[in-house]
Each structure stands twice: as structure tokens, then as C-alpha cells.
Amino acid sequence: MKEFIIKANKAVTNGEINLKDLPGSSGRLDLICRCVNSAFFLSHDLRRDTIFYSVNYGNPNPPVALKFIGDELKRLSPDERSIAMFIQKALSKDASEIWKESTSGIYYSNHEFKEIILEKKNSGKKIFYLHLNGKPLENFDFKNESDVVFILGDHIGLSKEDEEFLEEIGAEQISLSPLELHADHCIILVHNVLDRLK
């Protein structure tokens, strides 16, 4: 299983989303929609072995965590507007500590970014932090890693506190490129590497 977790620093946390202005008034929700697209969509199918989390910290009710489970997703289209409509439906509900299903394969809760990562770590999963200054991807051998979790930052990135937390729990830093990439592009590159190991 491949899992991706992104901290969306400004992404809205309620259902008041302007579908015509995802980058602006919705706190770069366009970025999250593109990440969902990259995480799951193939030419004529969906990736069933992938889970994607967006932990939103924008106004008015942070945090709200969204979880997309590839094996359960239905009726989701690859365009940003369609994905945003499904996100809007989830964000229109009251989040609690319990994961609740909004639509098929899409869940919401008020879990914190660190809380979700720690849960993965405690369940024995290998944590990787995608970072410009990490070790080159080609230096890692994923053949024996069946359950991997990749941490991403949005356009703002992770805070120093977040990075210290990741270091404390033993997350390994991986660099995908000498250039700074968009989060959705990082997801595609990771998929490509892992696809070739099958």
C-alpha cells in the first residue's frame, strides 16, 4: 500500500468553496485536487493500492483531515472541479475524532497532521519525507517495502516544528529532483518508481 499525506496550510475547512476560484478564496484547494488526480488516476482506471490524505489548516475550523481510499472510490472524475465538489461535500459536514464517510471512499475527521503520521509510524509503516535536500531517490531500495508513506508539503511547505517531528520519528528525507517540484508532480514521480518494481 502506498500512502501520501500532505499538509494543506491554507486549504479551507468548511463547505463554503467557490468552485470558480479554487486557488484563491479556497486556500489553494486546486493543489489538493491535482494531488488527488495524480494519486489515483490512470488512463482508464484508478490506482486501488493508494491512500491519499489532505490535512487542511485553513479557516474557519482547522484542522480537517480528508482521506481518499483508492479501492473504495466511485464516481470520481479526474478534473479539478469534480474533485472539488466531492471535497466540498466532505467539508460541509461536522468533523470529529472518528473517521466518517462522506461519499464512497472519501472520509473526513478532525485528526491532526502529526497524529495521522504517528499512527502510520506506530503501525510499522516506513515514513519518507519528500524534500529538496533529501537523499536522491535512486539511493533507496523499495523492493522490500510493501507499506510506504510519503509526506509532502504544499506551496508553503512544512514548518520547522513539523520537520523536527519527522526527524524525531525517524522519517527519511528523499529528494526527487534537484529542482523544486509541485506536490502533484512528486506523487506521479513516486508512483513511476514504484510501478517499475512490480
Curated annotation (Swiss-Prot):
The keyword rRNA-binding does not apply. Its EC number is 2.1.1.257. S-adenosyl-L-methionine binds at residues 130, 153, 176-181, 186. Keywords: Cytoplasm, Methyltransferase, S-adenosyl-L-methionine, Transferase, tRNA processing. GO terms for molecular function: S-adenosylmethionine-dependent methyltransferase activity; tRNA methyltransferase activity. GO terms for biological process: tRNA methylation. It catalyses: pseudouridine(54) in tRNA + S-adenosyl-L-methionine = N(1)-methylpseudouridine(54) in tRNA + S-adenosyl-L-homocysteine + H(+). It is found in: Cytoplasm. It holds the Pfam family Methyltrn_RNA_2. GO terms for cellular component: cytoplasm. It is an enzyme of class 2 (transferase). It comes from the Archaea. Its main location: cytoplasm. HAMAP family: tRNA_methyltr_TrmY. Belongs to the methyltransferase superfamily. TrmY family. Specifically catalyzes the N1-methylation of pseudouridine at position 54 (Psi54) in tRNAs. Homodimer. This is tRNA (pseudouridine(54)-N(1))-methyltransferase. It comes from Methanococcus vannielii (strain ATCC 35089 / DSM 1224 / JCM 13029 / OCM 148 / SB).
